[in-house]
Amino acid sequence: MKQIAFYGKGGIGKSTTVCNIAAALADQGKKVMVVGCDPKHDCTSNLRGGQEIPTVLDILREKGLDKLGLETIIEKEMIEINDIIYEGYNGIYCVEAGGPKPGYGCAGRGVIVVIDLLKKMNLYKDLKLDIVLYDVLGDVVCGGFAMPLRMGLAEQIYVVTSSDYMAIYAANNICRGISEFVKRGGSKLGGLIYNVRGSMDAYDIINEFADKLGANIVGKVPNSHLIPEAEIEGKTVIEYDPNDEISQVYRELAKKIYENNEGTIPKPLENIEIMTIGKKIKERLKKERMKN
């Protein structure tokens, strides 16, 4: 069983990417689980017709189990598989970690609890999974959100980014976390996924960033009107229009990720290097503004 984690700046299209990769793998006959590691608990909604599912932490609170240890909960069979795992598109297993009540506790606790619970309930083996995809909150590489890479649970980490300055800045911070944790047995970087967000996106900017990081760009997802169209319907592009070119892009990306067994230790850029890339982006924006 493979375990892969996806990180990236909030709003970069990470959940869209994860859901489409999951859908592509499920269509290939793989048994797939997607674990949403974001307190907003909407990571898997496009696999379930736009419907959100109860989170693991919400279920524990509703059953009055949030103060008990996981060993006690499992030993006394106080929680069942159907309480926390829901089926989505083409049999994909969907799990949402959730977070604490607003203003209370650590938002990363849900990630720690859900991964621990899934392992102790032996669900990965019982469900005979081929691959687990962790969709992890934005650019926070601390506490529970770092668990998939910190503990080496994921075989590789993939970072979703555009050529936007803040997306690159966040991607660099994530790679800094990867390079630090890998010294203690953490996960390596599988590569960057270039998610084109608009007409000003530039491949050469991402290529320069990847070269300096020592990272591969494993795929480029073009900007497409079909993506938001599909999401309004609560679907992936794979489900919404399986014959479109963008669906094939996701299939090829899914195949690359599933077959990749290699990882690298990134060399995060210093702030001065990130600022240099930022200035190049700024010059492009100014030139574009002058045209108009």
Swiss-Prot record:
The modification ADP-ribosylarginine is found at residue 109. The keyword 4Fe-4S applies. It catalyses: N2 + 8 reduced [2Fe-2S]-[ferredoxin] + 16 ATP + 16 H2O = H2 + 8 oxidized [2Fe-2S]-[ferredoxin] + 2 NH4(+) + 16 ADP + 16 phosphate + 6 H(+). Binds 1 [4Fe-4S] cluster per dimer. Its EC number is 1.18.6.1. InterPro entries: NifH/chlL_CS, NifH/frxC, Nitrogenase_Fe_NifH, P-loop_NTPase. CDD domains: NifH. Its cofactor is [4Fe-4S] cluster. Keywords: 4Fe-4S, ADP-ribosylation, ATP-binding, Iron, Iron-sulfur, Metal-binding, Nitrogen fixation, Nucleotide-binding, Oxidoreductase. GO terms for biological process: nitrogen fixation. GO terms for molecular function: 4 iron, 4 sulfur cluster binding; ATP binding; metal ion binding; nitrogenase activity. ATP binds at residues 8-15. It comes from the Archaea. The keyword Protease does not apply. Pfam families: Fer4_NifH (PF00142). The reversible ADP-ribosylation of Arg-109 inactivates the nitrogenase reductase and regulates nitrogenase activity. [4Fe-4S] cluster binds at residues 106, 142. Homodimer. Belongs to the NifH/BchL/ChlL family. The key enzymatic reactions in nitrogen fixation are catalyzed by the nitrogenase complex, which has 2 components: the iron protein and the molybdenum-iron protein. This is Nitrogenase iron protein 2. It comes from Methanothermococcus thermolithotrophicus (Methanococcus thermolithotrophicus).
